[in-house]
């Protein structure tokens, strides 16, 4: 073979080698970038930063818009205390990329109307987005009366707000409408902050049914609405008391369409579960079961949390199933927020509230003082988790993170089809 030919082939082989290596490096770079991106997505992000001087935030709430974007709401509390103690606004941020980046903070419901008692403060937001229209509903604790000092003559007030875009809200006071539902038995109440539940199965009018739990002086009262919050009705009737010693509570729809109540206890640490079993879902007929208390081996502080059921796939055998999540500080005091989880493979797993008091597994998220939390599943399958951490003289840092289901469940389950 002539030297020129050998030289040509050597150059050709070198070019091919360099081209191949370049392709491999590109692939490796993409893999590394994806890994870093995923790490960033699940990392903790302080969305609202409190301090001990002038900035005070509390109370997390989330909703997923129809386009999949996530809205995070919280109280901005110049008064550094609850509704009744001074001016409080509801503020928000939005993420369009599953929690990786966020918009600037924006006030969405403003307090400070000293001449109008209802408008002094608005907080403890409970929110939901209608899955069909994209309209958003927010229920607020409002006014200038402390919850503990509320009377029928001078009650703590209730605000209702609607929005089409998550940032511009219009609302009104509906205090009388809500108090009258319990026929005079309730003289103090508020909608539990966080996530209002919308049914995926029951539609008795234009909208799918929604549920929210009241914290009252007679324990929990669960309300439902078939017209997206314009009118509310006590589930089980005006005298129904699904958790007589319940405090702040959350609602979730069970896989068969029945209604799960998960409540903070007024009597100390722990959790109360109850289930409303429908006999006729469309007419909202049925009965609450006997409330059951969480086994005390599962530490749960006196604190608001969240409850959520997601479609899942069991990694051990690839079978579709459901996983129930509930979040709470995993301590006697407000420390170590985490998520308890358990599988609901069939109706037999939630045939009674008693069955929900045991069999939980744990995922601890926070390693310090932490309190209220809420969660929502995003369109990428991850759980949007928003919670209070690091107490700051009446406020907390409001922290967001995106959690894959397999991380929460220690590798046992992955997310199934995301509920729309």
Predicted regions and their residues:
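Bacterial Sec-dependent N-terminal signal peptides
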Residues: 1-44
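Asp-box/BNR beta-propeller blade signature and adjacent active/binding-site loops
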Residues: 42-420
């Amino acid at each position: 073979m002539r030297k020129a030919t050998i030289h040509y082939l050597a150059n050709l082989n070198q070019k091919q080698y360099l081209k191949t290596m370049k392709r491999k490096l590109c692939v490796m770079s993409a893999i590394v970038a994806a890994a870093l991106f995923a790490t960033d997505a699940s990392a903790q992000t302080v969305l609202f930063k409190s301090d001990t001087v002038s900035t005070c935030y509390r109370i997390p709430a989330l909703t997923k818009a129809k386009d999949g974007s996530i809205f995070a709401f919280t109280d901005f509390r110049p008064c550094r205390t609850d509704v009744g103690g001074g001016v409080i606004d509801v503020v928000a941020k939005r993420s369009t990329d599953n929690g990786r980046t966020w918009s600037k903070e924006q006030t969405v419901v403003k307090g400070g109307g000293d001449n109008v008692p209802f408008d002094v403060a608005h907080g403890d937001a409970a929110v939901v987005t209608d899955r069909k229209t994209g309209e958003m509903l927010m229920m607020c604790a409002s006014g200038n009366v402390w919850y503990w000092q509320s009377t029928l003559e001078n009650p703590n007030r209730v605000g209702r707000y609607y929005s089409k875009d998550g940032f511009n809200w219009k609302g009104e006071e509906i205090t009388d409408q809500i108090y009258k539902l319990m026929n005079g038995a309730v003289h103090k109440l508020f909608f539990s902050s966080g996530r209002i539940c919308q049914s995926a199965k029951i539609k008795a009018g234009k909208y799918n049914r929604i549920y929210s739990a009241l914290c009252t002086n007679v324990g929990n009262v669960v309300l439902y609405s078939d017209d997206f919050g314009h009118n509310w009705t006590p589930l089980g009737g005006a005298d129904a008391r699904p958790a007589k010693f319940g405090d702040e509570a959350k609602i979730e729809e069970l896989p068969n369409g029945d209604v799960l109540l998960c409540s903070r206890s007024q009597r100390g640490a722990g959790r109360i579960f109850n289930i409303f079993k429908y006999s006729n879902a469309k007419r909202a007929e049925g009965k609450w079961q006997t409330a059951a208390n969480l086994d005390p081996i599962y530490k749960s502080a006196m604190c608001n949390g969240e409850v959520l059921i997601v479609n899942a796939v069991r990694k051990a055998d690839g079978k579709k199933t459901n996983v129930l999540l509930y979040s709470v500080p995993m301590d006697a005091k407000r420390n170590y927020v985490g998520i308890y989880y358990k599988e609901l493979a069939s109706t037999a797993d939630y045939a009674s509230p008693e069955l929900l008091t045991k069999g939980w597994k744990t995922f601890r998220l926070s390693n310090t003082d932490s309190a209220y939390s809420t969660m929502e599943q995003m369109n990428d399958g991850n759980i949007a988790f928003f919670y209070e951490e690091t107490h700051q003289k009446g406020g907390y840092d409001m922290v967001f993170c995106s959690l894959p289901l397999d991380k929460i469940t220690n590798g046992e389950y992955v997310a199934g089809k995301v509920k729309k």
